[in-house]
Amino acid sequence: MSGIVSRLSVLGKVWLGLAAGALALIVFGLAAPGSSLFFPLVSLWCNAALFALALLVLRRAGVELDLFHKAVLVGLWAAAVLYFYWVLGSRTFLYHWDYVNYILKQYHAEAAFAQSAGAGFRFLLDSITEDYTSFITLFTEFPFCLSGKTGDDYAFCQVFSVLPSLLVLLAGLTVKVGRMLRVKNRFWYFLIGFSWCATFPFVRMSAVLGQPDWFGLIFAFMLMLLTLDYRFDGIDLPRYLLIFAATAGIILTRRWYLYFVVGYCFAYVLMLAVSSIRLAKDGQPSRAVHRMVRLVVFGLCAAGAMVLLLLPMVRKILSFDYAGRYSYYNFGGITLELAAQTLRIGLLNFILIGMGLWFAAKRRLPALPCLAGAELLVSLVLFTRVQNTGSHQMLLFVPGWLLLFLVGSAALADGLKKHTAVKLCYWGFTMVFAVSVRCSPLTTVALPGFVVDHFPLKAVSEFVRLDKLTYDRTDAAQIQRVDDWIDAHCDAEKGEFAYMIPHDMLYNSDIFQYAALPDIQLQGKLAAGISIPGTHEFPVRFFEAKYVLTAEPLPQTFVSGGELSGRWNALFCAARDAHFTQAASFDMGNGTVFTVWERTEPADRAEVEYYLDAFAQEDALYPEMFSQVAEAWLAGHGL
């Protein structure tokens, strides 16, 4: 046995160790169900397996990282640790909405695994049809389990659970692209290209805000490494299995990564078709036909297997009207999205892309720029049919943009013989600029924090004010006072709770509920307000709440015209004296004053219909979310 093991490669020994670890976990899970150690150990195993898979992909893609590559990689990872530590420690950010979803899922996954291993894995499987699956929690539990389990802890732990595999694959992708472009100055190419891509602000933007969606980039890079220079000239079953695994992984990470998958597959098939046509014209029609046949057979088999594997998700996608339900977020279509993409990429990056396009044209190497451009265009068109992107959804376009950055880096590196100092200063300035970018919920243009705070245009002064308030809170003490008041005046055992009308980035129920994670002081004591048509139901809990909280002025941070909390607040203010009396008031210290109103008269049909009638347009679009909800509540309360 020892002789067999000794003959295995290092990677083979790693996989043997992982298999032994998996067996040990199965035995441990059966022997000690509900152990607090089981989920962290599973997470540690998953991270090790993911890293081993990344190394296996590099080997299959024919990429080998030498000592220089590894030194740069480790140095950049160490710099990322310091960066995250500094950024998270220099702000007071309160996690809410999408920024708290994964943290809550991590808590829920921990609670499920605390019951038993079966309950934990069942919890993960049951989430497959949700907008936020629990797939990532398998990888983020370790080392999160060793931390204080705050929101900042969750963001920081991603540097250890997500970033190593991501950087290894990005380094491999950089080497692969350099080889395909026949770069001569490989030292500077890798240094410039790898650092340029790794520091691109929208790679880390969501992670700094508590959203580990960049986890999907791991599988995107795997897919690109396995396919960029592969032309189906022969049958390669191990590669096919890895491509399938990478595709499944990226879809399980976030459903909207499907737009990248579709866009990339379309661009890749188009590239392969063009190369096959050229091959046929060069006198090799048989080889060209065999290429396309293998591609079609693999594509059909992979698509069929993927549908079977992700059948619950496929059913949800086919049965749910995403364009209708998410229409609120489609506030400008492709025209506005193109403008947003332009602002996010920025002038410095477009200069690099321009250099890359000129470089590719001169060397007659159009494949990679065309592949990236086609992928971006298809993904962009498909996504904007449903909605426009937020900063975290920008991740589905990141692989295409990074590919263009690498082509530009090749041009910059191979052109260093001329104007060397200017070009190196351009690279250095861009790195400093990129690292200094503020990662805020309101970030539209990637700018350093000091530039945002002192932006000279008065037209954006309100944006700057709100950006400061949401990114680095100065009202934590005031929020805690409101929390303490609600906690003292609502008895959860009696079913008492408060309802909050404001549902805005500046103030919403999540801000108050999750102000002191992992402690959730107002668990079951604070209900969220209505805001997004197609997402939020008619809020019948308003009529059950002991207290209603509103604010003056009502927070409305760059909301679209169809936003609902403003309308509800106006209706409440016009009729509140008939059913409520003022109970308390809180000055938040930033121009906003919260007022607590206590219900004095129980809700009746007339009050419910008063509010429902004001949402006739929404009711016509979503009756199952408005009139049907209201009527069911009225019937349940004998009204």
Task: List each language-model region with its residue ranges.
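Transmembrane-lumen/periplasm boundary regions of multi-pass, lipid-linked membrane glycan transferases
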Residues: 102, 108, 260-261, 265-271, ...
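Short acidic/glycine- and proline-prone juxtamembrane loop motifs at membrane-interface regions
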Residues: 202-215
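Start-transfer (signal-anchor) and selected internal transmembrane alpha helices
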Residues: 1-86, 290-301
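Signature aromatic-anchored transmembrane alpha helix within multi-pass, membrane-resident enzymes
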Residues: 9-10, 70-74, 187-191, 241-245, ...
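Transmembrane-helix motifs of polytopic, lipid-linked glycan transferases
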Residues: 55-58, 153-184, 222, 354-361
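Membrane-proximal lumenal/periplasmic loop motifs of glycosylation machinery
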Residues: 89-100, 114-138, 157-160, 205, ...
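C-terminal luminal/periplasmic domains and tails of membrane-associated envelope-modifying transferases
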Residues: 465-500, 505, 514-639
